Amino acid sequence: MNYSFTERKRVRKSFAKRVNNHQVPYLIATQLESYAKFLQADKPAMSRLTEGLQAAFTSAFPIVSNNGYARMEYVSYQLSQPPFDVKECQQRGYTYHSALRAKVRLIIYDREAPTKVKEVKESEVYMGEIPLMTENGSFVINGTERVIVSQLHRSPGVFFEHDKGKTHSSGKLLFSARIIPYRGSWLDFEFDPKDILYFRIDRRRKMPVTILLKAIGLNNEQILANFFNFDHFSLTANGGSMEFVPERLRGQLASFDVLDENGVVVIQKDKRINTKHIRELEAAKTKTIAVPDDYLIGRVVARNIVDPDSGEILAYANDEITEELLATLRDAGIKQLETIYTNDLDSGAYISQTLRTDETADQMAARIAIYRMLRPGEPPIEDAVEVLFQRLFYSEDTYDLSRVGRMKVNSRLNRPEMEGPMVLSSEDILDTIKSLVDLRNGKGEVDDIDHLGNRRVRCVGELAENQFRAGLSRVERAVKERLGQAETENLMPHDLTNSKPISSAIREFFGSSQLSQFMDQTNPLSEITHKRRISALGPGGLMRERAGFEVRDVHPTHYGRVCPIETPEGPNIGLINSLALFARLNEHGFLETPYRKVSNSKVSDEVVYLSAIEEAKYVIAQANATIDKSGKLADELVSARQAGETMMVSPERIDFIDVAPSQIVSAAASLVPFLEHDDANRALMGANMQRQAVPCLRPDKPLVGTGLERIVAVDSGTVVLAARGGIVDYVDANRVVIRVNDDETTAGEVGVDIYNLIKYTRSNQNTNINQRPIVKVGDRVARGDVVADGASTDLGELALGQNMTVAFMPWNGYNFEDSILISEKVVADDRYTSIHIEELSVVARDTKLGSEEITRDISNLAESQLSRLDESGIVYIGAEVEAGDVLVGKVTPKGETTLTPEEKLLRAIFGEKASDVKDTSLRVPSGMIGTIIDVQVFTREGIERDARAQSIIQEELQRYRLGLNDQLRIVEGDAFMRLEKLLIGKVANGGPKKLAKGTKIDKEYLADLDKYHRFDVRPADDEVASQVEAIKSSIEAKRKQFDEAFEEKRTKLTQGDDLQPGVTKMVKVYLAVKRRLQPGDKMAGRHGNKGVVSKIAPAEDMPFMADGRPVDIVLNPLGVPSRMNVGQILETHLGWAAQGIGKRVDEMVRQQAKQAELREFLKQLYNETGRIEDIDNFTDEQITVLAENLRQGLPFATPVFDGATEAEIGRMLELAYPEEVATSLKMTPSRQQMILCDGRTGDQFERPATVGVMHVLKLHHLVDDKMHARSTGPYSLVTQQPLGGKAQFGGQRFGEMEVWALEAYGASYVLQEMLTVKSDDVAGRTKVYENIVKGEHTIDAGMPESFNVLVKEIRSLGIEIDMERN
C-alpha cells in the first residue's frame, strides 16, 4: 500500500469490510470546474467552447445599427493578471478580480453600395471586472471571503401534472401541462372542471386552447383531424350505414339491433357488445353496419360539408348533426359523411367542446385575441400583433429553451432525437396538447416534480454567466443606439461601449445576491460543507413560505446524489441540502452518482455515472451485498433497487452495484462514526453541529473516526500540501522551504518551493486560523503530502474536538436535562481553550470643521491610558488590553461654541488648544480582554505616512526579501554544484590565481576560489565553456527576476491605499482573545448529543477509577434511550479500547521492547480484522515513529454503514485490557463498564457505570458572546422602553408571562416599578437615578410613555380618547 508522509506516521486502523477502489472525488471540484468553464482563462482565444463568457459574447454580438450601415462584431476576450493577490485583497478590503477586455471589430458599410465595406476598425474594449475564484473555491469580495451556493431549480422542459383533486369540490383530477423555458414566457395548458382545455401565457388570463392552435395556423378541420379518429358513414334514404371498426364497438351499449351483411340480428338492442359479438360479425365478413338516423343525431361533423352543385357550405366542421341537417344533406344528395369518434372511456370530446367555446374565426383573429390578452388597452395593429406573436415563442432573442430544455421536451414527448432548435415549434405545442389530452383519456402518467430528473443544479459559473448576460444586454441596447453615429463622427469601438452596466450587474450578484453568502469559516468542515451546499431558494427558485412538504421531503432519487441527513433545522429544512459524497453534475446540470458495473453477477471495476433518469432503467444492488473471492455476487437473493422501489432479486438480474456504503451521505454526515446506529433526527443534529465546532488551541485527532478525516482536511485547503516532492531545506514557524526533486523541475524553473504559513489570522467567524509545520529539515516529502497543519487538523487529519474520558452516570443533578459536568483538569490542560481574533478598526475623515487626526496627543487622558500607544498614537503589538483601553488615539475638531466669561478667562490663562477637539479614540469594547497581535495602517494617496505605517512596510519588505534570498540561495547552490561537476577534471586555457594553460582543474583549486570567480576559469573545451556561460547567465537572469519582483512588491506597498471618499487614514487592530471553557458554554458529541456545561468540578471530586484516574466528563445516561442515538455508546466503547491499546504501546515503548515484539503487536492490532495494513514494509525507524504516535491511543476508522461490529469492538477491548488489567480496574467481563468511586467520599458507587472515550466538541455558542448586563443605556425612540439584545446594549424583557408571575405573588410594588421607572416612565426614571445618587431610596412612579403611544394610536383610528385625572 502507498502511504503518504503523514499517514505512515500514524496509521488509522480501519474496520472497513469492503475495499473501495473508487476514491472520493475532490470535494470542491463542482465549484472550481464550474467557474473554470465560465472563464476559460487558460484556453487560447480561438479554441474556446461556446459556454460561459464566450457564449454570452457570441449571443450578444454582432450588433447591427438600426439603419444597417454599421455593425459591431466580437472577436475574442482576455482576462488580465489580478493586480493584488488573495491575501493583499483581504487585508486592504479589495475584491480579488481580473479586468476583462474584449476585442471587437467595427465594420462600416458604404451607403451607396450597402454590401461594400467602407472601413473596419478593431480595438480592445474594457468590459468591467470579473471576480476570480481562489484555489479553495471561494471569492474575495471587498476583503471578505464569500461562497456562491449552487441552486436547485426546476429544469426547463415540459411537465405534466394534476391538482390531486384539490381544486374542485367533486375531487375530480384536473390535468395541466407547462412548458418552462430557460428564459422567456411560460406556456400553461389546463383543463377546467367542465373538461374544456385552456391555455395561459405567463400565468395571465386563460383562453381556450383552440385560439392558440388557430394562431399557429390550423383551421377547425385540421384541429379535429389532429385530435380525433373519424367514423365514416354512407347516407341512404332512411338511415345509413357505418364502416365496421371492431375496436370502437367493443364495450359499447347497442342502441339498436345490429345486423350482419345477411340481415341476421347479431346483437340485440340494449345489449353490451362483447368480444363474442365482434367475432361473429368478423366471421360473417361484415364491412358495414346499418344504423338508424337516431344513431347519427348528436354526432359531430368532422369536415366542412359542401353542396356539390352550389358550392355552399351546408355544415361546418364541429357542427352537431340535427334532424334538419340530415334532411338538408339528403336533399343536397350528400352520400358520404365523416364524424369524430369519441367515447366516455378513453377518447373524450374535449377539443371539440373547447372549439365550441372559441369565438375566433381565423389565424389573424386568434393572434389579435392573444395580443389583447397580453397588451390590454393597446390597439392591435397588424404588424405589432405579428411581431408580438413571433417574439413570444419563436424568437431566439426573447425565448431560449436551452439544450437541457430541448432534451427534456423531446424525451418527454417520446421523440427519438435529443437535439433541436432552442425555440418552440408548432409541433412542440401540438404534441404537448396531444399528450395532455391522452393523460385526460387515461393514457400515460403525470410527472413527479420532486424527481431529481426534473430538478437541475445551477452552479457558480452558470449563475455568473446569467448576470453577465443581463449586463451585456443593457450594453447591447446602448451600443445599438450609438452605432448610427459611428460613421458620421468617426468613433472607435471603445467610444461606443460603456462597461458600467456589466460591472454593476456582476458586483450586485457577488455582493448582495441571496446565493452569494458570507463564507462559514468556523472550521474546515463548515467551509467545505458551505461550498457543497445546494439551495432551492434564491432568485428563480422557491419561496420559503410557499414550499410545501413534498419539496422538502427525501425522495428516492436523492440516493447517492443529495444527502438525506444533512439539512438545517427550522424553516429551511429540506430546502437547503448537501451534495452526497460521490455525486457530481453532468453536462446538463443534473446530479449523477457512480455505480460499478455488474455483468452475469460478476462485479467489475468499471465505474459508470448515472443520472436519476438513467438510473430508473436498471436494477442496482447495495454496496453491502456479499461478494466472493472471484468478484461474483454470492447470495441467492440480493437486495436491490429499481425506479425507487426496493426488492429482492437474483444476482443475474443485477446491472450495477453502489461504489461505497457511504455514497448516500454528505461529507459532514460521513464523519459521524456508527451513524447507522443513530436515529435520523439526531444524526441530522450531529452532522450540523460538527460545523459549529470551534478550533481548539491544541487539536486532537478523534480516536474513533470514519477514515474520511484526512480527505476532508486536505480538500478544505486548511492544511499546506507539497506542490512538488523534494527534501525539506528549512523550517520555522512562518515558512517551510523545500528543495524540489530534479525530475519534477523543468529547465529554467526555480527548484525551490517556499510555503509561507498563515499565522494567527482571523476567519469570517472570528476563529483563529493558524498553520504549524509538521516536517523537519531533511524529511523527504512527495507531491500532495501534508507539510503543515492548519486550524482543527492534527497530522493532516480533521480534529474538531478533544478525546475525553466520559462516564455515563448522574452526579448530584449537575447533569440534569443534558447538562455536562466537566473536570477542572480539562480546563487546566487547556484542552478546550480556543483563540478568537477580533478586528477593530478606526478611520480618520475630513470633516467640515477640519480633518480628524490619529495622534498620541490627547488632552484629558491620563498617561497610564496612553502607556500602550507609540508616538503615532497606535497601540503596540503584544500589549495586553481590556475593556475601555485606548487602542488608537484620535481627535475630532469640535464646532466653536459660545463661551462664558469664566471659560474665556481659563482659556486665556491655560492656552488655546485643549477644547476645540474632542476625544474619539478607538477603545476596546465592553467585555473583551486580549492581546494585540497585529496592526495595519492604511493611508490615502498623497498623505504622508506616519512612523508606524513606515515601520510596518519595512517589516513586510524584509520578510519578502528573506523569501527571495532563500530561493536565490538554493538556486545558486544548485548552479555552483553543476558548475563544479562540469569543471573538475577538465583542461583549462587559463584562469584566476595565475592558472597555467593546459592545467587540469581539481577540487582544491576551485575550493580556493571565491564562488563568483569560478566563472572566470577558461576551459579549453568550447562545449564546456558555453555550458559555463549558460549557468552564469541563468543565475544573472534569476537575480534580475528577483530584484524586479522585490521592486514590484515595494511599489505595491508604498503606493497609497484606495480608501472610501473622505477617509484619510484607516487603522485596523487585531486583538486575540483566549477563551477557556466555562459554565454556560455549549458542547456536543457527534451524534446530536448536545448540552451546556453546568459546573467545572475540581478533579479530586470527580468519579475515579480503581487506578485513581478521574474521568473528564460525566454525562447523563437518560440522554440516550429516548433519543435513540446509540452510536455514542458504541463510540465510547471503541474509544476506550483505543485508549487502552495506546497505554499498552506506551508501556512497550517505555520498557524499550524489542522491534520484532513491537512489530508483531502492531500486526496483531491492524491485521486481525478490517482493512489489512502493510506493516511488514515499514522500516524500523518508521515503526518507532508509528509507536511513538500511538502512545495516546490507536486511532480507529469505522466507516459509515461499514463499521466495526459488536464482536470487533469486543475483540479490541480484549486486546486493550488483558484479563489482569481488567480485573485490577474492576471492569465487568465485557470490559464495557467498571466500578467507579466517588471523588468526594472515596466510596464505591453501588453499580458499574459505562466508561469510555468520546470525541467531544466545543461549539461556537460561547457564553462570553452571550453574557451581557446593563444598568442604564439606550432607549427606543417611540415607546421610550430600553432596547433589547447585546448588540444594542439592551435590557432584559419583562414580558407578559413574567407580569402574570408577579401578579400571582401579589408583588404590586415590584410590578409597579417594573412597568414604570425601570421601563418607560421618563420623568420617573430620571428622578429615581437622582434619588439613588443622593442616597434617598424612594420612588415616585408616573405615567408610562407607552400609554401615551396607545392613546395616540387610538386617536389615529379617529376615536377621541382623553385621560381624566381625579
Curated annotation (Swiss-Prot):
The keyword Cytoplasm is assigned to this record: no
InterPro entries, per database record: DNA-dir_RNA_pol_bsu_ext_1_sf, DNA-dir_RNA_pol_bsu_external_1, DNA-dir_RNA_pol_su2, DNA-dir_RNAP_su2_dom, DNA-dir_RNAP_su2_hyb_sf, RNA_pol_bsu_bac, RNA_pol_bsu_CS, RNA_pol_bsu_protrusion
EC number of this enzyme: 2.7.7.6
SUPFAM superfamilies, per database record: beta and beta-prime subunits of DNA dependent RNA-polymerase
Catalysed reactions, semicolon-separated: RNA(n) + a ribonucleoside 5'-triphosphate = RNA(n+1) + diphosphate
Keyword Nucleus tagged: no
Biological process terms in GO annotation: DNA-templated transcription
One of the record's GO cellular component terms: DNA-directed RNA polymerase complex
Keywords: DNA-directed RNA polymerase, Nucleotidyltransferase, Transcription, Transferase
Assembly with partners or alone: The RNAP catalytic core consists of 2 alpha, 1 beta, 1 beta' and 1 omega subunit. When a sigma factor is associated with the core the holoenzyme is formed, which can initiate transcription.
Functional description taken from the UniProt entry: DNA-dependent RNA polymerase catalyzes the transcription of DNA into RNA using the four ribonucleoside triphosphates as substrates.
NCBIfam families in UniProt: PRK00405.1, rpoB
Designated name of the protein: DNA-directed RNA polymerase subunit beta
Gene for this chain: rpoB
